[in-house]
């Protein structure tokens, strides 16, 4: 008989960022365990709050199915000797299958007799198997863990209670002295402990005790309350998804409430107010319909509406203190000149082996000047880049950024404009940090893009120069994120810069300054490989097929925009019959070209038939076509230049024996193929493209 099963893990409050990954991990482990045990089940529900992780499995079978198996052993001529007695091979097979030799059967397979063993394994009761879930619970991993009392188990937070209920029956096991039972607990202040009679009643029973166990239901309730307040007050409440997720996992019973702050604080930059409310207090800022920030906020309490006015006043008091501090920092910062702030960077260590922040700024200045030239920026933009680079990091020494590190760049822009810098310079200072995370916007201005590239490139290359290379999950300087940011900037801006040239130039510059602790040539190869792997990661995330990505990355690393353009073109063509034929022809050329001897050049005097001359002419047309196409970054035209020589290639192979007996003729034909192959492989390695049968 199928019955529902509930597993609930009660904990001290988990950090909000732990909740979703933890319940996802637990749900995946439980489902994998059920599948491994061969147990049939219905729908699986996940429930998670700061104080509990729970899995409800509907219609869980009461036992495993019986297993009937038949295994083939050795051939009969090996299983029995001349006297008909069982050999060691047969005895060993029978023992391995857990049967007697008298139970072995003989069957013919393709005309040969073999011995077979039939085994019957009775399925175990589910109630006997379920205690194994203890190992799944103790096997959960967390970003940080702790130990408590004298127990050896490391966990996110101390375990407070355990529920394991199969139908009406408790599944017995214990963890760190906590025994499983049917008793769970409601809201810490509004609810009470209570027994569960049946797993199915879990979510509804908790609601009666002021706990909304379903995270999506809590999130929807919060959004609904925010929308209601918007309508009541004619406000606009921008919903930051990260903040919404965090608040959802901070409460078990959400109730939204509003508060206000003094109008005078609106004189502070909008970003300062939003950061103070959102990042430090987990409040939702409130705006007017025209986008102006209003002196109100919305917060979400973990409880009901009782004494809500007092709660609002308490939150207002906390925010007032925070904003007063911010106002003090803001006014104090403006007493320091940009030059004085910049000079303090010489006293801040970026890394003991790479130098100070002042030295980093100098490197950024040199790199950005070179990048601006390579990107063909105009004279005005170059001046903007030069000035922005010179003062790029001055805001790091301000009180405001010291208190709110997430405002670096933003405060640089604000203070730079107040100090008389041009809006273009100020914006570039802000944009140097973009993109800050996956999916974030890239710089809008050319100057900002160049400064962002220089900053990120210096961080990556300088770390590599002293052996700080990401390994596995270890990436303390976020070099993967920095490299990914570089790739997205190059892709969106279409700058004619290659990752390889950028990395090599930056490394050579660092080497000249004496910061290298690693071998230069080895580090260059590590950097090129690192950027290629990051590019592959970004392309796969963009949805390109792995084989097309591998094909494109096998070609020289040209500018990122062109790499993506080639991948898009190949993706569009991938299912065309003609594309398959083109790929086969091009691959045939590149495959045979591997046999070409080095140092041999094509000689028309050694041609013996017209197809050789035609292939040479086609090769010259391909070279010209590719050159013209890449001048305007036209991946389609470049592909067409290759595709148009398909018929000529096929005719050549139909009428010409490449591996001729005469060595000179053979080498000349291989050299001809090698010349064409170089053009083909400059686009992609077509041999890596996979076609479905």
Curated annotation (Swiss-Prot):
What's a single GO BP term from this record? Answer: glycyl-tRNA aminoacylation
Q: Which InterPro entries match?
A: DALR_anticod-bd, Gly-tRNA-synth_bsu, Gly-tRNA-synth_heterodimer
Where, per UniProt, does this protein localize? Answer: Cytoplasm
Q: Which GO terms describe its molecular function?
A: arginine-tRNA ligase activity; ATP binding; glycine-tRNA ligase activity
Q: Which PROSITE patterns match?
A: AA_TRNA_LIGASE_II_GLYAB
Chemical reaction(s) catalysed: tRNA(Gly) + glycine + ATP = glycyl-tRNA(Gly) + AMP + diphosphate
| Keyword annotations of the record | Aminoacyl-tRNA synthetase, ATP-binding, Cytoplasm, Ligase, Nucleotide-binding, Protein biosynthesis
The EC number(s) attached to this protein equal 6.1.1.14
Per the record, the major location class is: cytoplasm
Q: Is this entry keyworded Cytoplasm?
A: yes
- Which Gene Ontology cellular component annotation is one that this UniProt entry carries? cytosol
Protein biosynthesis as a keyword of this entry, yes or no, is yes
Matching entries from NCBIfam families are given as: glyS (TIGR00211)
Identify its protein family: Belongs to the class-II aminoacyl-tRNA synthetase family.
PANTHER family given for it?
A: GLYCINE--TRNA LIGASE, CHLOROPLASTIC_MITOCHONDRIAL 2, GLYCYL-TRNA SYNTHETASE
Quaternary arrangement and interactors, per the entry? Tetramer of two alpha and two beta subunits.
> Could you identify this protein by its name?
Glycine--tRNA ligase beta subunit
From which organism does this entry originate? Answer: Shouchella clausii (strain KSM-K16)
In the UniProt record, what gene is named as encoding this protein?
glyS
